[in-house]
Structure formats: structure tokens, C-alpha cells
């Protein structure tokens, strides 16, 4: 499939998701910027979040249930309230931002990876040579069990401690997204970007 047609189809899906408010509101401006480049199109994204997830065992997505999720900071009381609703094991998880971007060619992929690395996304790279998909990701993550079958496994002081760290790590990821946006805006302004 030709790049232009591929990008057009992916943009259609993105715009539909954006109109249905399925795209994290705090990352829309960055995604629009990425999509404004001729040689990039976003495939999926998450601006980072904190969640309480009920799981039978770690990694078991099929039976998982979100008991609470927040894309901005969260209060200890909100996490505790969500965890107490667990029927299995409630995990407090702080997810870092992640964006998948298809690029027209390897040169465009390298340019995007350089901008991502400059912004602090050190764990970014090409994850597929088909459409040169770049994963922009970082390592800010917390994942630990906090309750089981409605009973807290940790005391209030420890829960307060990890929620504070989760909020700080979430903010750090959001700051990186801001730096990525600045790097791409600078690239656009300098007219340094050209397709080969």
C-alpha cells in the first residue's frame, strides 16, 4: 500500500477516535503535531496513567478489570477505595506514556527517534520494519499488589508513599511529552525536516 493511502486510513481512524473522546485529551495537541508531518502518522497512544487493576495473576489481561484509572494525579483515598472493591488481587500500576508512530521511511524514523531521545524517551526505537513503526516510550513505571479480595495488603503509610511516587512518575512522563512536543515544534519551525 502506498504511504499516502496508508496515512489517510490511519488518520481517519485517529480522527474518529478523537471525536469519540477515546484519545487522552492531554496528548491530542502532540498527536496532531506528529500527524502534521508528511512522513509520520500515529497508530496508538497513551499519555500515561495510574490505575488499580483487579487481576487473578500478573499479566492476565483477559480476566483483568479496571477498578479505577486516572490520567492526572490521584489521591490516596481514591486508590484505597478502588482497591477495596477487588475480588482478586488489586494492583496499583503507574503506566508511562507510550506512542506508536508509523514513518514513511527509515530516515523519518531516525529523525523521530532522535527527537524522542532528546525529550528523554530513552526507550524508543523501531519495533517494526513494516511501515517503520517507532515506539516512543519511557521507563517510569510502578506495579505492585495493594489489596486482595477487598482487604488491604499494605498499610496507610506505605500506600501514601507509593501513591506519591506514582504521581511523581506520572508527572515526569507528562513533562517528557511536553519536551517531545517542543522538539517537534522546533523541528517544524527550523524547516529542518525533509522527506527523502
From Swiss-Prot:
This is tRNA(Phe) 7-((3-amino-3-carboxypropyl)-4-demethylwyosine(37)-N(4))-methyltransferase. It is an enzyme of class 2 (transferase). Belongs to the TYW3 family. One of its GO terms (biological process) is tRNA methylation. The keyword Translocase does not apply. Its EC number is 2.1.1.282. The keyword S-adenosyl-L-methionine applies. Pfam families: TYW3. Keywords: Methyltransferase, S-adenosyl-L-methionine, Transferase, tRNA processing.
Amino acid at each position: 500500500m502506498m504511504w499516502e493511502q496508508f496515512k489517510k486510513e490511519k488518520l481517519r481512524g485517529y480522527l474518529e477516535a478523537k471525536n469519540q473522546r477515546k484519545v487522552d485529551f492531554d496528548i491530542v495537541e502532540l498527536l496532531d503535531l506528529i500527524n502534521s508531518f508528511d512522513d509520520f502518522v500515529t497508530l496508538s497512544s497513551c499519555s500515561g496513567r495510574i490505575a488499580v487493576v483487579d487481576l487473578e495473576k500478573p499479566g492476565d489481561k483477559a480476566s483483568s478489570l479496571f477498578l479505577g484509572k486516572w490520567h492526572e494525579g490521584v489521591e490516596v483515598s481514591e486508590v484505597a477505595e478502588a482497591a477495596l472493591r477487588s475480588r482478586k488481587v488489586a494492583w496499583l500500576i503507574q503506566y508511562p506514556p507510550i506512542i506508536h508512530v508509523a514513518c514513511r521511511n527509515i530516515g523519518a524514523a531516525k529523525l523521530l527517534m532522535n527527537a524522542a531521545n532528546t525529550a528523554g524517551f530513552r526507550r524508543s526505537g523501531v519495533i517494526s520494519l513494516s511501515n517503520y513503526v517507532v515506539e516512543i516510550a519511557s521507563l517510569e513505571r510502578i506495579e505492585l499488589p495493594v489489596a486482595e479480595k477487598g482487604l488491604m495488603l499494605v498499610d496507610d503509610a506505605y500506600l501514601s508513599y507509593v501513591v506519591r511516587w506514582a504521581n511523581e512518575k506520572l508527572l515526569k512522563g507528562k513533562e517528557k511529552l511536553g519536551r517531545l512536543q517542543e522538539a517537534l515544534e522546533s523541528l517544524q519551525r527550523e524547516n529542518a525536516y525533509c522527506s527523502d
